[in-house]
């Protein structure tokens, strides 16, 4: 049974009815909108946000949260033109429910996706429970638009039985290296892994599979950006059920490292009720040096490791080109251009 969306009182919402439904339920009502600038920026329980920009539109692809044992089965997209007002897709674009869904190999645990564009196609990587192997595996779905429709491949592409393995094959993050024009996928739980993506983006080049070094206290949630000749890797430390879940940071001379640990750049502020700040992604406003970080935290109030909400804050660099520790806020960010 799907849990009812919980809408924090700080939000002003329109057309946002609470619903209780089975995982197969398809919400055909018109898209949801968040009108107010206060956080969270996405209504209800959403975690592991992957923020991206395509053209003039920003997208967040999150884990649909609020289920025991992170048992959500659906992926939705959210979109915005100003990073403050977000509209959700009226229907899930992927449902991980075996033959009742549209991802043949997966039965639930729709977790931590990432998306990237290549040659006009959009590749959406995600993890799910794979009953064939009785573990989490990573798959890919393809579309001609960031809003879909997406077609999932019939089998998972990373099975966690490769030459190098991690605790779980989860938390993928796709990255285009602007220096080499190579496409990479990062993933892992307990130990980080990366590999170059194949030319068709549907598998990894197994000869490039490696475990990057220098990611002190790595737990999960890798994310890579590039700025002014430096590769910036962020990742999550501790357990998502812990209020001390936080974001670690390392830099390197290439997309594969070696990386130098730079410390923690995002952590809780208990004085504000902000706890378990982790599993981030980062986006640059095209044509500027303005950067933003999306991440989840325990829902306020009374959230926990399966009741998480997504917010956005500004991200800055110092004079040496390193990320400055992020100040988590309850206000989130002003609309772009305001």
Model-predicted regions and their roles:
Residues 22-338:
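Carbohydrate-active catalytic/glycan-binding domains of CAZyme proteins
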Residues 1-34:
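Fungal secretory targeting signals
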